Amino acid sequence: MPDLRWKAYGVAALIFALDRFTKWLVETNVSVMDTYHVIPGFFDIVHSENRGVAFGILNDSTSEWRTTILVVLAGAAVIFIAAMLWNAQRLDRASFWGLSLILGGAAGNVFDRAMFGKVTDFLDLYYRDYHWHTFNVADSAIVVGSCLLLIDLLRPKRQAANVS
């Protein structure tokens, strides 16, 4: 398992770097709330700033503690996931990838919130009147990682053969 630990942290670091790079590209090239139509009627790049959590929850909160509380809670989750990876004796492939993706995505969003007090979102999917909430690479990694963990949880485990 020691080799896998470093691979997991490497995957997380790549997700973190990709997330930070894409946010930087948007922050330096797209004004807040400007829109670039990538696939008209389906996908846009829209620079938005989220001071809350997923789906804009707490975005309108005026509490001076909002950012501190969110950084502490999400930071604790990052530490917990990193410790799970470090202490794991064995991980199925789906759990390995799932935890690695979640760790990288969560670290990316925690970094932004701690450094800037907000998270930059820019990926905008929609179809006609249906509009998904704007998100970023870190959010995508967290969702894909969570799905992989769910698949691993629901997938039947192989039973050891009975030798008697």
From Swiss-Prot:
Its EC number is 3.4.23.36. It is found in: Cell inner membrane. One of its GO terms (cellular component) is plasma membrane. One of its GO terms (biological process) is proteolysis. InterPro entries: Peptidase_A8. The active site is at D121, D139. One of its GO terms (molecular function) is aspartic-type endopeptidase activity. Pfam families: Peptidase_A8. The chain crosses the membrane at residues 68-88, 96-116, 134-154. It is a multi-pass membrane protein. It catalyses: Release of signal peptides from bacterial membrane prolipoproteins. Hydrolyzes -Xaa-Yaa-Zaa-|-(S,diacylglyceryl)Cys-, in which Xaa is hydrophobic (preferably Leu), and Yaa (Ala or Ser) and Zaa (Gly or Ala) have small, neutral side chains. Its main location: membrane. Keywords: Aspartyl protease, Cell inner membrane, Cell membrane, Hydrolase, Membrane, Protease, Transmembrane, Transmembrane helix. Pathway: Protein modification; lipoprotein biosynthesis (signal peptide cleavage). This protein specifically catalyzes the removal of signal peptides from prolipoproteins. Belongs to the peptidase A8 family. NCBIfam families: lspA (TIGR00077). This is Lipoprotein signal peptidase.
